[in-house]
Amino acid sequence: MANSLIDEMRNGNSNAIVAGLLHHGAIYRMNAIAFSSLQRRSNKEIVEKIKALRTDHFGIDGYSVSDFAIAALDILGIEKYTGTNQNIKRLIDCRFNFMA
């Protein structure tokens, strides 16, 4: 069942993306952020949930949920990133295309 949530997010299910953004597992939040960005999801509900994750420092493989959130907000044109964090810069540069 858990993998099906990620599959639903990948397939563009908005409800699954919202569920992923609210999920207790960092991998689900990170996937939801990445798929939101890839799919250009910029509706108010999703953007507000991504903004709330800018301070979420849980993560995997050296990247945090906040890295993903900050990069996504830049990619979506919501908040331009001007910092120096290399993880965030790499995510912005690749635009989450590794998830496609």
What is the predicted function of each stretch?
Residues D7-L21, R40-D56, I78-N87:
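Amphipathic alpha-helical scaffolding segments comprising HEAT/armadillo-like alpha-solenoid repeats
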Residues H24-G25, H57-G62, D93-F96:
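Short inter-helical turns and helix N-cap capping residues of alpha-solenoid HEAT/ARM repeat scaffolds
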Residues M1-M9, A26-R41, I60-E79:
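Structural detector for internal amphipathic alpha-helices that build alpha-solenoid repeat scaffolds
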Residues I70-A100:
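Eukaryotic acidic, Ser/Thr-rich intrinsically disordered low-complexity regions
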